[in-house]
């Protein structure tokens, strides 16, 4: 993690360049704004990550409950809002100066992203997509606790089979937000409107999708509580060690 964080500014410069071509003073300004965001994040966000990781480890030691998962979800979403708002504030003045050709370049890249989303999440029949969902959840859990038992894998499989597929809704919601952002940029109103729009990405979401997401979250959190109850001592030690290492990494990065 430390290596990735220390090189995040380089990645952001490369990523931004895949959306819009900036030259000369504009490219220099982008570099300065990325550096400013990275410095802000190190100073303001990382210390909060340290506290969150330590609190999560304490809660995990006592056994996960639904309130614990709600706390973690709300805390992470709050941190995401702060970061994307700051990023939008820094990017907005540059976005307001883009030419129509540059805005069109961003739109084309978003269309490419949407085609990739379709390949990643909408390809295949329902059975294939549910199998892919089960593998994704299994892989993420094993990142934290190590190899799952057969009983735990069966719990994941049952969850993947039971829950509705939301990817079509996700695709529509992505396009909704993209359209709103592009409209703000075209109107040259990024400074006035973009930070609030980005930080509240769920506003304007289809109410049916919002309800489906809440149902998914309820079922997923129940799966996590059930898996937690079945963890072996070794699995629990591994997960606790991961949380502790995250806290140590965040603390070391914040101190630089």
Language model region names:
Residues 2-101, 105, 109, 243-246:
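N-terminal Sec/ER secretory leader and immediately downstream segment
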Residues 23, 99, 149, 232-233:
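Histidine/glycine-enriched, metal-chelating micro-motifs
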Residues 35, 96, 146, 222-225, ...:
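Extended, non-membrane alpha-helical segments enriched in charged/polar residues
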Residues 1-19, 77-80, 84, 88-92, ...:
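Extended, structured, electrostatic nucleic-acid-contact surfaces
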Residues 62, 66-69, 123, 127-130, ...:
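Alpha-helical rod/repeat scaffolding segments in eukaryotic adaptors/tethers
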Residues 37-41, 114-117, 164-167, 247-250:
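A short hydrophobic/aromatic micro-motif that marks alpha-helical segments and, especially, helix-coil
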Residues 89-204:
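Extended amphipathic alpha-helical interaction segments
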